[in-house]
Amino acid sequence: MSEDRVTNIVVAGLGGQGVLKASGIVSDAAFRAGFDVKQSELHGMSQRGGSVSSDVRFGREVFSPMVPTGEADFLVVVAPDQIEVNRHQLRTGGVLIGPDAVDGKKLTNKKSFNVALLGVLSRHLDLAETVWLEAIRAAFPEKLHAANLEAFALGRKGV
């Protein structure tokens, strides 16, 4: 990542899938790495089952929380039916991380699927693994640390 470049990430899925939790973890990890971070949320029908997306932007200096349409470097999608709904956010050459990027059957806690996708995302970002782990621990109560750290490791290793 160039020093002045802003990294644009859109996390999308359905209400109840941890989209906002995932984008919060990305934001926290980037902040812990020393970047200026902006985040915005589009809840839509954010009750369980409705479309939800959240933009995360980080870099040396970020002015707007919104990822301009067609400029997302990364599109992380938790629900398969949300891929086409959100594909227009991705820039040409951007990276789509969809639900098929992780084998959910290998997770001990299926609710940690969103964090497993962050593990995949982490392979593409120049953020130290330690800031990710700190952000994950900060996002969940202690009793959920092991399951979420395991999910992150699964995605990060690409298993």
Predicted regions and their residues:
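Active-site cofactor/cluster-binding pocket
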Residues: 1-159
